[in-house]
């Protein structure tokens, strides 16, 4: 059936997401599948994102979604329910559409303010009037919110994985996955010191003010005229 399909649209078990997407790519299929947001950092998935072979779909950019489950499925999770016909549903957080079908939303440029304007006008108290930090062990800017990315910063930035919801491949270049130890080593990121309790010795980027490792960061930078259209 897979070999005969032109486009695959499905909701595979999240536990098999890595293997299933790899199979679709291996067979050269166009696809639209539901998966967990955390799949961004999977070692088998991130290279596809970085190489511009996998991206987010048009809908589902936040919150959770409701899914029908079999009659035998236990309803232990919060938000689960049974409708008037006895059909069971659960709500799942952090789900997204994953696809290799191009769409217009993917090429919408993210509107941004300059660093100075972010510090002055940002809606985020962590940025407004405070500014940005550079990691203790890596020369990159910590950007805690996607809409706080400075438009005029040319260096590498660490952003939340939810950045991919707004990612325009013509506007930004994805450099590395902060959860990938090998990529961090290749970038020259040394292990964190003992003051980073719980992450000492790990190749994570450290935030000086909190003495904590930044949670699940993607490293990006603005595309320049020289890199626009250039894919790795």
Regions found by a protein language model. Give the residues of each.
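Class I S-adenosyl-L-methionine-dependent methyltransferase catalytic core
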Residues: 1-232
């Amino acid at each position: 059936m897979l070999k005969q399909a032109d486009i695959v649209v499905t909701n595979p078990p999240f536990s098999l997401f890595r293997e299933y997407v790899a199979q679709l790519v291996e067979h050269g299929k166009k696809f639209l599948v539901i998966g967990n947001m955390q799949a961004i950092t999977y070692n088998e998935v991130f290279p596809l994102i970085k190489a511009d072979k996998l991206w987010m779909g048009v809908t589902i950019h936040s919150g959770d979604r409701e899914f029908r489950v079999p009659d035998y499925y236990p309803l232990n999770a919060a938000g689960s329910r049974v409708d008037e016909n006895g059909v069971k549903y659960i709500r799942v957080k952090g789900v997204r559409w994953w696809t290799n079908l191009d769409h217009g939303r993917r090429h919408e440029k993210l509107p941004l303010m300059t660093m100075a304007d972010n510090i002055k006008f940002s809606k985020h108290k962590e940025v407004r009037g405070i500014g940005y930090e550079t990691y203790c062990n890596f020369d990159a800017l910590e950007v805690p919110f996607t809409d706080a990315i400075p438009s005029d910063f040319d260096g590498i930035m660490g952003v939340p994985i939810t950045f991919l919801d707004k990612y325009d491949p013509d506007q930004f270049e994805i450099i590395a996955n902060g959860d990938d130890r090998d990529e961090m080593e290749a970038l020259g990121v040394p292990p964190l010191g003992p003051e980073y309790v719980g992450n000492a010795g790990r190749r994570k980027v450290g935030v000086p003010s909190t003495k904590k490792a930044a949670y699940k960061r993607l490293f990006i930078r603005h595309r320049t005229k020289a890199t626009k259209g250039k894919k790795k």
